[in-house]
Amino acid sequence: MTVSREEISTILDDALFLPVKLYSLKVNQRPNHSLIEVVLDNLEHPYGSVSLLECEQVSRKLKEELERISPDLDFTLKVSSAGAERKLHLPEDIDRFRGIPVRLVFRSGESEKNQEGIFRIVNRDGDQVFLEKFQKGKKSAVKKQTTLNLKDILKGNLYVSI
């Protein structure tokens, strides 16, 4: 017995409560077993972190509903937070995480190789993203500003400085 990704997504729509939303869903179906991985996001937390209690509540609701609609389903369920160094969903996360350090991989007209850097998102105007180079612990230093076109940003993650 299997359950589809769409069925799980529908159950999650009912199980989730704002400010918690679905970040990603992976369903790996095997002939006799399913691995269901749910990753959550908290829209009100500065880094999107979800509490253990929130993960537990969603896990419990999803498990109960899966057992109700498909009692013979053999599955492993993993519910977690997207994490402090989560992958950015572009372009919407550019606005959401303004002011927070991010690690970006981007194309630069000056080089054939992809570039990488740690920046703070200052602002976005259409496809232009205004950044300043992140300098750990240097509050009064002159901030080096740069501008990237959104299409040149290949990937990004939140960056946690310890």
Curated annotation (Swiss-Prot):
TM region positions: none
What is the native source organism of this protein?
Answer: Leptospira borgpetersenii serovar Hardjo-bovis (strain JB197)
Localization, per the record, is: Cytoplasm
Tell me a GO cellular component.
cytosol
Xref: InterPro entries: Ribosome_maturation_RimP, RimP_N, RimP_N_sf
What is the protein's given name? Answer: Ribosome maturation factor RimP
Using the chain's own numbering, where are the disulfide bonds?
none
A GO biological process held by the record: translation
Keyword list (alphabetical) reads:
Cytoplasm, Ribosome biogenesis
HAMAP family in alphabetical order: RimP
Extract the Pfam families matched here.
Answer: RimP_N
For this chain, the family text in UniProt reads: Belongs to the RimP family.
- Function of the molecule: Required for maturation of 30S ribosomal subunits.
